[in-house]
Amino acid sequence: IVAPNKLHYVYMEEWSQAYPTAKVWATKGLEKIFADSKVISSYTILDKTVTMSWQSEIDYLPFEGSAFIEESVFFHKKSRTLILTDLIENIELLEECSCWHRFLFKIGDNTYPNGHTPRDLRMTFLFNKEIARKCYQKIKSWEPVNVLFAHGNCFIGDAEEKLPQAFFWLE
């Protein structure tokens, strides 16, 4: 069970209860929250030094450089699929979306079909952009074909074209 960043951990206790023998992994920044948990008694903080049982199938990288958040990035080697959480959003503005939501997504610069790292998240890398650029170069070196992420339409089969567009701010 993986908490990929400090914004995506809310149901970790429920998943831990449902699967009590599962190993729990958490990204840096969740130590205090997990230490206060009455359910999650054992967990491992993901960092560059930790050994994971899935290493032969999945590569791991902590995407660093943000003043606010560190995100765990994964790459499934066999399918050449990059797995992100919030580093790219590609929100489709459906007719049901209110004008207010449309406005927020537009200024967030994270709408379909041109998904990007959201503008507010990009700003958190302002003072450590070189660190983020090194992380981006690493994920590009994996040569993903697909990119999965938590918010919006994923990039299936066209990662080579879409990834540089999404990370234009690090190109």
Map each language-model feature to its residues.
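Short, flexible loop segments at the rims of nucleotide/cofactor-binding pockets, characterized by
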Residues: I1-P4, I58-E64, M123-N128
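Active-site HxH/HxHxD metal-binding segment of metal-dependent hydrolases
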Residues: I1-S53
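Active-site metal-binding loops of divalent metal-dependent hydrolases
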Residues: K6, G29-L30, T85-L87, G152-N153
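Cap/insert and terminal regions of metallo-dependent hydrolase folds
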Residues: Y11-E14, A18, L93-E171
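Short glycine/proline-enriched coil/turn segments at helix->beta-strand junctions
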Residues: Y19-T21, K77-S79, P144
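Catalytic core of the metallo-beta-lactamase
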Residues: V39-I107, K134-S141
